[in-house]
Amino acid sequence: MEILHDEDVDDSILRDKTIAVMGYGAQGDAQANCLKDSGINVVIGETEILGGNKNPSWEKAKEDGFEVLPIDKAAEKGDVVHILLPDEVQPAIYENQIKPQLKAGKALCFSHGFNICFKRIVPPEDVDVIMVAPKAPGTEERKAYLEGFGVPGLVAVKQNPSGEAREVALAMTKAMHWTKAGILECTFEQETYEDLFGEQCVLCGGLVELMRNGFEVLVEAGYPPEMAYFECVHEMKLIVDLVWQGGIKRMAEVISNTAEYGMWAVGHQIIGPEVKEKMKEALKRVENGEFANEWVDEYKRGIPFLKASREKMGEHQVETVGAEIRKLFAQK
């Protein structure tokens, strides 16, 4: 894939446009401030009152110097309507507050393709649909911008009736300094399917289960829980940092020969062909929409499984022991 940088992108197309950022959470905060600091006209769309109280996100956006409007008013004002709300709440807010404000020539922008990919949001045909997706959390994104650099990102175009959708999306990434690191062009489907697969099988689901099971095996074999936590959870960051810095090869060069031998001799016996087949099944469930339907149904029912899972993990010994171990690293 070609990687695009500053010299490949012209962001002047944004100079006469207003970007309405919907939501002022971690990504809304980071992206809106980066755009604003690059001279782009940005307004924030938020809910002013939540549960009878002032919405902290509304107040913070005002304190940060933004014009903050109700979501429908911001959508009306924006040439680019950039939806950075949680996936599960986007469809209802879009249908009731954003869709009535759309007209030909506007662009709908996302940082994750879930609702477009699975048709939870179906935009009008005369509206551009684009995606700008940073490959970093909001805090790191903003930190990199302030340091004069940026984070890598993805760009995708789903609809382009105006003929300038790609240019607008790329211009947004340049204004946020992502092109200083590098931009990859993809499709909504590629970003969505790979993101969900990675979260479920490797980064979140796979990693958590690997750590939890490793911890349990040691504890059940009679080893001290504190030592089990160090070996199976705490030291994970040390290894991941090495991979992040120089790849798997570099990590293997840095660890001891004993550790490397064990990695090659035993690792494939734990994560073997049968696990790979399970991963393939999970990918199919993502691609055919089965997982999306399951998650939407879970949300409609009040997230009972999610709540129960959170409670169960909170009570697990790995969490109670971990809380004590982390105190050892807290500065007094």
Curated annotation (Swiss-Prot):
Active site annotation, chain numbering: 112
Keyword Transmembrane applies: no
GO process terms (BP): isoleucine biosynthetic process; L-valine biosynthetic process
EC numbers on record: 1.1.1.382
Cofactor(s) named in the record: Mg(2+)
Binding site for substrate: 256
Binding residue positions for NAD(+): 24-27, 46, 55, 57, 87-90, 138
Keywords of the record: Amino-acid biosynthesis, Branched-chain amino acid biosynthesis, Magnesium, Metal-binding, NAD, Oxidoreductase
Binding site for Mg(2+) 1: 195, 199
Domain KARI N-terminal Rossmann as annotated: residue spans: 1-186
Signal peptide: none
InterPro entries per the UniProt record, alphabetical: 6-PGluconate_DH-like_C_sf, KARI, KARI_C, KARI_N, KARI_prok, NAD(P)-bd_dom_sf
Cofactor note: Binds 2 magnesium ions per subunit.
EC class (word): oxidoreductase
Residues that hold Mg(2+) 2 according to the record: 195, 231, 235
GO-annotated molecular function: ketol-acid reductoisomerase activity; magnesium ion binding; NADP binding
Pathway where it operates: Amino-acid biosynthesis; L-isoleucine biosynthesis; L-isoleucine from 2-oxobutanoate: step 2/4; Amino-acid biosynthesis; L-valine biosynthesis; L-valine from pyruvate: step 2/4
Reactions it catalyzes: (2R)-2,3-dihydroxy-3-methylbutanoate + NAD(+) = (2S)-2-acetolactate + NADH + H(+)
KARI C-terminal knotted domain sequence ranges: 187-332
Presence of keyword Magnesium: yes
Subunit structure: Homodimer.
Family membership noted in the UniProt record: Belongs to the ketol-acid reductoisomerase family.
Functional summary from the UniProt entry: Involved in the biosynthesis of branched-chain amino acids (BCAA). Catalyzes an alkyl-migration followed by a ketol-acid reduction of (S)-2-acetolactate (S2AL) to yield (R)-2,3-dihydroxy-isovalerate. In the isomerase reaction, S2AL is rearranged via a Mg-dependent methyl migration to produce 3-hydroxy-3-methyl-2-ketobutyrate (HMKB). In the reductase reaction, this 2-ketoacid undergoes a metal-dependent reduction by NADH to yield (R)-2,3-dihydroxy-isovalerate.
PANTHER family: KETOL-ACID REDUCTOISOMERASE, MITOCHONDRIAL
Name by which UniProt lists this protein: Ketol-acid reductoisomerase (NAD(+))
Species, as recorded: Uncultured archaeon GZfos26G2
Lineage: Archaea, Methanobacteriati, Methanobacteriota, Stenosarchaea group, Methanomicrobia
Gene this protein is translated from: ilvC
